[in-house]
Amino acid sequence: MPSTIRLEVVTPEKVVFSEPVNILIAPAIDGEIGILPKHTPLVTGLKTGVMRVKKDGEEVKISISEGFMEVKPDEINVIVRTAELPHEIDVERARDALKRAEKRLNSRNDRIDRARARAAFERAIARLKAAGHY
C-alpha cells in the first residue's frame, strides 16, 4: 500500500497546498474525517475549520472555510472559499475579527445578520487555531 496520497487544496484565487501526504484529517459537515492512501472514492462537504495534514512525521494545519472534498484512491482535491497556511495568517487581524464577531453575536440588535456573524466567528477561530494561537 502506498504511504502517500496527493493532496491539492485550491481556492478561487490560488492553489494553497499541493503535495503528497500520509494522512489528511478534515472538518467534514458530519464530523472529522480521516483520509489515508487508497481511500474509497467519495465526495463530501467541508465546514469552516482546521485541516490537519501529516507528512513525513510533520503536521501542517490549514485553516479553511466551507467547500467540498473529492477523494480518489490516489488523490484528494479540496475546493474551498478560503484556505491559509499558518505562516500566511495575520494573528492580530484574526483576533480583531474574533472580537468583532463576538460583539455582533452578543448584540441585542435585531438588524444583525446572525448567520454572517457566526460564520465570521468560526473563520476567526479556525485561523487562530491553525496559527497556534487559540
Swiss-Prot record:
Pfam families: ATP-synt_DE (PF00401), ATP-synt_DE_N (PF02823). The keyword Transport applies. It is a peripheral membrane protein. InterPro entries: ATP_F1_dsu/esu_C_sf, ATP_synth_F1_dsu/esu, ATP_synth_F1_dsu/esu_N, ATP_synth_F1_esu_C, ATPsynth_dsu/esu_N. Keywords: ATP synthesis, Cell inner membrane, Cell membrane, CF(1), Hydrogen ion transport, Ion transport, Membrane, Transport. GO terms for molecular function: ATP binding; proton-transporting ATP synthase activity, rotational mechanism. Its main location: membrane. The keyword Nucleus does not apply. SUPFAM superfamilies: Epsilon subunit of F1F0-ATP synthase C-terminal domain, Epsilon subunit of F1F0-ATP synthase N-terminal domain. It is found in: Cell inner membrane. F-type ATPases have 2 components, CF(1) - the catalytic core - and CF(0) - the membrane proton channel. CF(1) has five subunits: alpha(3), beta(3), gamma(1), delta(1), epsilon(1). CF(0) has three main subunits: a, b and c. Produces ATP from ADP in the presence of a proton gradient across the membrane. Belongs to the ATPase epsilon chain family. This is ATP synthase epsilon chain. It comes from Halothermothrix orenii (strain H 168 / OCM 544 / DSM 9562). The lineage of its organism: Bacteria, Bacillati, Bacillota, Clostridia, Halanaerobiales.
